[in-house]
């Protein structure tokens, strides 16, 4: 794992570190030394400062989301609790990647006696990243299930998704993902671990896609049924659909940002010596940047899609330190 960092390689997990280390040797064997010394098959270098900067931005943004949800009682609903879980996962993924940049720098600059300790720290960070990835996927799936219940079981929703039940679900998600993440790193020498992670990723996406196909095919029918009920049923149903659309955007961004990373893993398993696969895998650092961008983009989506959350952001950022600035800005 140490040798894989000499060309500025910043790997996000121990098994990915190992795969990137083999990248150049595979290119050399199959394509000749001239190809591996430069061009498409040379590892793309990204400055460590970029990783650290994105990590800090993600940390501040997602802390803001967590504080806003905790502060505003109007946001104490199942969907926002799951969003809070997603924000924690995003924050840990991005901050851990930024922290690993520092660890890798220390790994390359310290002597042999201290490298073993640094490697152990790196493995702990890898476990956090892997656990957070799994928690992100599970949190997105939980939000999808929550939106499904709000649309198809609107009248029974509050009996089904109680706050206590949501807290238990989130606790179980993080407990299971933490154990799984640690096991993935412990047994990272096996290709079966990568295959398992890829399978989990696409299985979760398939489940969410199935829920959404059903939701959007039947949503209009349920809106018509709710509309004939007294009170504000139609308004509530419209808000539920808005939440479903918000999650659609979140899932879309998640897929765009994470798909290249998982495609890298698929190529590493299936065609590690194919010239096109090697060329794609040489941009691994770029895929890590995309992953961190996902953690930066998600809080912006929350703010754009939720007026209540946006209002709370404004109160936290402006009103406390700057007094009446929020009152002034609200007039315009």
Swiss-Prot record:
Positions contributing to Ca(2+) binding: 100, 122, 126
GO process annotations (BP): adenylate cyclase-activating G protein-coupled receptor signaling pathway
Gene Ontology CC annotation, any one: plasma membrane
Extracellular side: 1-43, 107-123, 187-191, 272-280
Location relative to the cell: Cell membrane
Single GO MF descriptor: melanocortin receptor activity
SMART domains: 7TM_GPCR_Srsx
Topology versus the membrane: Multi-pass membrane protein
Keyword Metal-binding included in the entry's annotation: yes
Highest taxon, organism lineage: Eukaryota
Keywords: Calcium, Cell membrane, Disulfide bond, G-protein coupled receptor, Glycoprotein, Lipoprotein, Membrane, Metal-binding, Palmitate, Receptor, Transducer, Transmembrane, Transmembrane helix
Residues bearing attached sugar chains per UniProt: 3, 17, 26
Pfam families according to UniProt: 7tm_1
Transmembrane domains' residue ranges: 44-69, 82-106, 124-145, 166-186, 192-215, 249-271, 281-304
SS bonds (residue pairs): 40-279, 271-277
Cytoplasmic topological segments: 70-81, 146-165, 216-248, 305-332
Subunit structure: Homodimer; disulfide-linked, also forms higher order oligomers. Interacts with GNAS. Interacts with ATRNL1. Interacts with MGRN1; this interaction competes with GNAS-binding and thus inhibits agonist-induced cAMP production. Interacts with MRAP and MRAP2; these associated factors increase ligand-sensitivity and generation of cAMP.
Functional summary from the UniProt entry: Hormone receptor that acts as a key component of the leptin-melanocortin pathway at the intersection of homeostatic maintenance of energetic state. Plays a role in regulating food intake: activation by a stimulating hormone such as anorexigenic alpha-melanocyte stimulating hormone (alpha-MSH) inhibits appetite, whereas binding to a natural antagonist like Agouti-related protein/AGRP promotes appetite. G-protein-coupled receptor that activates conventional Galphas signaling leading to induction of anorexogenic signaling in the hypothalamus to result in negative energy balance.
Family under the similarity heading: Belongs to the G-protein coupled receptor 1 family.
Name of this chain's protein: Melanocortin receptor 4
